[in-house]
A protein has these predicted regions:
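Long, intrinsically disordered low-complexity tandem-repeat segments
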Residues: 31-74, 79-81, 85-86
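C-terminal accessory segments enriched in acidic
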Residues: 105, 113, 125-127, 164-166, ...
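Structural recognition of the beta-strand scaffold that forms the well-ordered cores
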Residues: 193-196, 205-207, 217-221, 231, ...
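Beta-loop motif signature
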Residues: 31-33, 87-136, 140, 151-158
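Short glycine- and acidic-rich boundary segments immediately preceding or forming the N-terminal edge
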Residues: 157-200
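Active-site-adjacent structural elements in enzyme catalytic domains
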Residues: 132-134, 141-144, 149-155, 177-183, ...
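Sec-dependent signal peptide cleavage junction
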Residues: 18-30
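Active-site/substrate-binding loop(s) of hydrolase catalytic cores
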Residues: 229-230, 237-239, 243-374, 378, ...
């Protein structure tokens, strides 16, 4: 009995010793202690606890709290270093440059007129006026003068290509979007204006390429007849090409800039946007309900793809006063109806207003199709165009039929009509490359004649 009591007391003492050791370990900050033997419990705290409890707060907490603000501060400093917050110390009477240039990336500039910082964008052609001191150049944007660091200026065009020539139809909406993009990219040399509204309230655009104050002018029209809309795509591509190469490309030894600074192009790329829409999509795309319903009535079963007239069945190229209502159709329809009175249509009025405003020296009319050209007499112009296109000469004669050419002839304005592509219109899209290749230099060549 006594031996049994002694044994129980010994076990209790050992157990109390283990509990005391565990309690001591917990009070000294030990959290992870394996429940194995007394030796493991006493050895681990001495080797691991001081390192784990002291290193964690010293290495992680200060670094996390101090590093983040240092990084953001550096970025903020980098952003502001390229932005002149005050007028740079620059003498603006520097070396003349006077040509188009671009910036290598979006950068800040100082607007001298508004006395504030603004941004100039990559992919936009600016008129670089002067190279000044202290690493700055003076550029012009409209009537504004901006100081930009010279190191950011390049004279190689970095504008994105805009006109999509793979588009088989190339609609009025496509042209409208592209005109806006072109004017943004090349606003220093290209201006887009509106001469009026069509019957279905589409804008009648015309563009001025080159020096708007140039004394000589070449006027160009395309897509007077609805189904001839490929000429709009070709013309829009030519406009973009001339803008992209304005300060770098040459035609027969003369820079584009030299030619177009002295002889401007005024182009109406889609004279008949309602008609083009009808030819491409049918009357369903005409927004005005009365016009739409009337189109179905006057069509006479004709496939709308071959539509030539405007939205009320009047042929714009028969609506001029000279020879008005001579021949042609007697009722509204898809072609050759002159209307009730001359110059009755908004599209005709728009053309007349632009011609009277710009007073062109020469006019080029693009139609389709047949690869022929019409002109009143053999001239230096017609001979040059033949050498470039090899389109067959056709003398139009003295009889008038209310066409735009008749209107021009009556005012002694030299003109020539080029019929691109092969019949019938609308010309197949596979003909586009040949049309473009044959005619891409026509306008710059005509302009060069007037230097």
């Amino acid at each position: 009995m006594k031996k049994t009591l002694k044994t129980l007391m010994l076990i209790a003492i050992i157990a109390m010793g283990i509990n005391l050791t565990e309690a001591k370990a917990k009070t000294s900050g030990e959290i992870t202690v394996p429940e194995t033997t007394v030796q493991e419990a006493t050895t681990l705290p001495e080797t691991t606890t001081p390192q784990e409890t002291t290193v964690i707060p010293e290495t992680t907490t200060p670094q996390e709290t101090t590093t983040i603000p240092e990084t953001t501060t550096t970025k903020a400093e980098e952003t502001t270093t390229v932005q002149p917050t005050t007028k740079p110390d620059v003498d603006t009477t520097g070396k003349n440059v006077k040509k188009g240039g671009y910036v290598k990336k979006n950068v800040s500039a100082y607007n001298l007129k508004l006395e504030e910082v603004t941004e100039v964008e990559k992919g936009v052609c600016y008129y670089v006026y002067k190279e000044c001191n202290n690493g700055y150049s003076l550029i012009k944007v409209g009537n504004q003068e901006l100081l930009v660091e010279t190191k950011y200026i390049t004279y190689k065009c970095n504008a994105k290509k805009i006109v999509n020539t793979s588009d088989k139809k190339y609609s009025y909406s496509d042209m409208k979007v592209d005109l806006k993009k072109l004017e943004k990219a090349y606003g220093s040399i290209l201006k887009v204006d509106i001469a009026g509204k069509s019957l279905d309230k589409r804008n009648l655009y015309y563009v001025t390429l080159g020096n708007a104050k140039a004394k000589k002018t070449v006027y160009v029209e395309t897509s007077v007849h609805a189904r001839e809309y490929m000429n709009t795509k070709f013309m829009m591509k030519v406009i973009e090409d001339y803008c992209r190469g304005y300060d770098t490309k040459k035609y027969k030894g003369k820079k584009y800039s030299t030619i177009f600074n002295n002889v401007k192009l005024v182009i109406m790329p889609m004279v008949n946007p309602d008609g083009v829409t009808i030819s491409q999509y049918g009357p369903k795309k005409i927004r005005n309900a009365k016009l739409r319903e009337n189109l179905y009535k006057i069509a006479g079963g004709v496939d709308f793809k071959i539509w030539k007239a405007n939205a009320r069945g009047i042929d714009i190229n028969r609506n001029y006063a000279e020879g008005f209502d001579r021949g042609g159709a007697k009722i509204p329809g898809h072609k050759q109806y002159a209307g009730k009175t001359p110059i009755s249509e908004p599209e005709t009025k728009a053309q007349v207003s632009v011609v009277e405003k710009v007073k062109p020296d020469v006019v080029i009319c693009y139609h389709q199709a047949g690869e022929v050209m019409y002109h009143l007499n053999h001239t230096k112009l017609s001979n040059m165009l033949y050498s470039m296109t090899h389109y067959t000469h056709i003398i139009s004669g003295q009889t008038h039929y209310g066409t735009f050419s008749d209107y021009l002839d009556a005012r002694n304005i030299l003109n020539c009509t080029l019929e691109t592509g092969l019949t019938p219109a609308p010309v197949k899209n596979s003909m586009y490359k040949k049309i473009y290749k044959t005619n891409k230099d026509v306008l710059v060549a005509v302009a060069k004649m007037y230097l």
